[in-house]
Amino acid sequence: MKIVEVKHPLVKHKLGLMRENDISTKRFRELASEVGSLLTYVATADLETETVTIEGWNGPVEIEQIKGKKITVVPILRAGLGMMEGVLENVPSARISVVGVYRDEETLKPVPYFQKLVSNINERMALVVDPMLATGGSMIATIDLLKKAGCQSIKVLVLVAAPEGIKALEEAHPDVELYTASIDQGLNEHGYIIPGLGDAGDKIFGTK
């Protein structure tokens, strides 16, 4: 599995600000979107382009355009919605697919409860977004759903990832690509990432 930890100074700075315990909902939400945008920039660096001719201000001019690669952004409810706007800033024509998976706090197992995928997802590259890759259960369950629907090109974008989650994802889906702003220390006894960001969903939606 291709694993990319994005170490750009802007990414590290913004993620560092997100780790502050008393950060406001507004600021956390803004930063989640901004880091999501920067991760998208890196994750889409291998998109193919083609040369086309358009009419410029002084006559015909050749330009580079992305070569017909359709994209669907797949936020995992609910926290993934916090990164979606930043992703769409870079790929505004992308369609949106939504998957709902929550983690049972006792068993730590993923429980799928909702999915609404674009009809031609088999023709699209999926950018799956979720702030945290902890145990990997929710992400694996989401990718299971996408592959069952025919999606063959999948990239995962997360703000922070635990080594345990990375290992589980690689074992389940070695063909996907992972882009993260940080590979953190690991999980505590409750399955939360250390140092992590706390509960990203609560911080994005202000439901502490």
Swiss-Prot record:
Gene that produces this protein: upp
SUPFAM superfamilies: PRTase-like
Regulation: Allosterically activated by GTP.
Molecular function in Gene Ontology: GTP binding; magnesium ion binding; uracil phosphoribosyltransferase activity
Binding site for uracil: I193, G198, D199, A200
Family: Belongs to the UPRTase family.
A UniProt-annotated Pfam family: UPRTase
Keywords recorded for this protein, A-Z: Allosteric enzyme, Glycosyltransferase, GTP-binding, Magnesium, Nucleotide-binding, Transferase
EC number assigned by the record: 2.4.2.9
NCBIfam families, per database record: PRK00129.1 (NF001097), upp (TIGR01091)
Binding locations of 5-phospho-alpha-D-ribose 1-diphosphate: R78, R103, D130, P131, M132, L133, A134, T135, G136, G137, S138, D199
The name this protein goes by in its record: Uracil phosphoribosyltransferase
GO BP annotations listed: UMP salvage; uracil salvage
EC class name: transferase
Origin species: Yersinia pestis
Function: Catalyzes the conversion of uracil and 5-phospho-alpha-D-ribose 1-diphosphate (PRPP) to UMP and diphosphate.
